[in-house]
Structures are given as C-alpha cells and as structure tokens.
Amino acid sequence: MSDIVVVFHSGYGHTQRIAQAVAEGAGAQLLAIDADGNLPPGGWELLAAADAIVMGAPTYMGGASWQFKKFADASSKVWYTQGWKDKLFAGFTNSAAMNGDKLATLTYLWHLAMQHSGQWISLGLMPSNDKAAKRDSINYVGGYGGLLTTSPSDASPAEMAKGDLETAFAFGERIAQVAAKG
C-alpha cells in the first residue's frame, strides 16, 4: 500500500469534508493547514515520506486561500532540493458558485506540483452531462484535471451534495490505484 497524504486548507469546513472523502477513498492521511497557514508538527516530514500528495484548497476570489498559498511558498525549501521530485500529485477545490473560477485554483495546484517536478493524476471520471444528470450525480461539476466541488454559500458542510462527496471518494480510490502501480 502506498503512503498518500491529503494536505488541505478549509476556511468554513466544506473543503475539509471533501478532503475527508478523498482520504477515505485513498486510504490516506489528512494534513490540515491551520488558520495561520501553518502545518502541524511533523507535517513536512509526513509529506516527505509520502508517495502521493493530494492538495486541496477552497477557491476564494478566483484563487486558492492565502493560507494554502503560505504553505505553497514555504514548500520552496523542498523545491530547492527537489525533495518531492517524481512524487504523484493530485488536487481539488471547492467554491460556492457552480463555476466560481475553480479552474484557476486547480491550475495553481497543478503548477505547484510541476514546480516540484511531480506527476499529476487527473480525476479520471466522465462528467454527468446528459439530461438525466442531477446535482447528486457523480462528477456533476464536470472536472477533468482534478476534483471540482460546489457548496452553496448558505449551506453547512453537512449539507454538501452527495454526488460531490461520492466523486471525492472515487477520486481518492483512483489516486490509490495509480499510486499502487508505482
């Protein structure tokens, strides 16, 4: 079994709920970036030992949260030594609007993985894009490069769409399958 770590920031609990579903599907460890943009003790060592790093951030104002960006900037010490070279990476984001410019955040996560000379794992699921599709369908938001989820601004984390949570779990399973291939 591969060591997979889901590192994420969540401002209101929605991105955390997605992170938990991805981690459950992947059999991964969760690593939360705190409200000040810091990892807990041992966090950098956990990432160094991982075979795959899954990154998650909410989309705020067209990009990742500042707390996630602080973590990303701090990873430049790892970049300098190419400590994450050839690791597997994947990413996810959540926003209140259906589009919400989530692709900008996902692209940011991809760029960060590329800076670290990593290999990216796509979502690997077809979108639910026919007339029969419902909000609780798998990959209703229609991501390809990574997981995109939507939480209405007045919805609590407990009210998240079942389809988004199931898509997150399936994404985690895919990450574990790719990581197992070595």
Enumerate the language-model features and the residues they cover:
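Glycine-rich phosphate-binding loop at the start of an alpha helix
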Residues: T107, G143, K162
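Gly/Ser/Thr-rich helix-start
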Residues: Y12-H14, A57, G63, D101, ...
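Generic structural "secondary-structure junction" signal
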Residues: G62-G63, D86, N94, L123, ...
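Short glycine/proline-rich, acidic loop/turn segments that cap or connect secondary-structure elements
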Residues: K134-S151
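Short, glycine-/small-residue-rich phosphate/pyrophosphate-handling segment
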Residues: L88-N139
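N-terminal beta1-alpha1-beta2 submodule of the flavodoxin-like/Rossmannoid cofactor-binding fold
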Residues: M1-W84, S153-G182
